[in-house]
Amino acid sequence: MRIWIDADACPKAAKELVCKFALKRKLEVWMVAGQPQVKPPFACVRLVVVESGMDAADDYLVEQAEPGDLAICSDVPLADRLIKKQVAALDPRGREFDARNMGDKLAMRNLMADLRDQGQMGGGQAPYGERDRQAFANALDRLLTRLQREADLRASQPHR
């Protein structure tokens, strides 16, 4: 299992938490970005800066991630693409994307985009704070535990 991060949009505090969890659990982290980033100084972390272009980093992430991997992203359409590929997805505020909630999340995202386009709503999310960081840490721990159990179960079953 690998952890993928949509690095352009992920808060630094969330990236640092992912690295800590990955070190503890001996997992690889792949940070994918469309803009140059500072790579954390850990051997388990890889940084891929893709050529610029609309959705180039998202496309790379979707192409490379495999079922059973985990992606950290706040981009709802990207999460939808990953979920369809059986890649788990979690946003940096600790909210998990899954097949059951994707329809609602896409509809809400589209509604908010329409309202912003019409000038009826401004701004974006609130700044990333300690409450977000704690919610993310808790959700990340739970999700990694579940994914590792599922991977262990698959590995212990005879191949057909």
From Swiss-Prot:
Q: Which cysteines are disulphide-bonded? A: none
The record's InterPro entries line, in alphabetical order, gives:
UPF0178
Instruction: Report the superkingdom from the record.
Output: Bacteria
Q: What is this protein called?
A: UPF0178 protein PA5247
UniProt xrefs under Pfam families: DUF188 (PF02639)
Q: Member of which family?
A: Belongs to the UPF0178 family.
Which PANTHER family does the protein's record reference? Answer: UPF0178 PROTEIN YAII
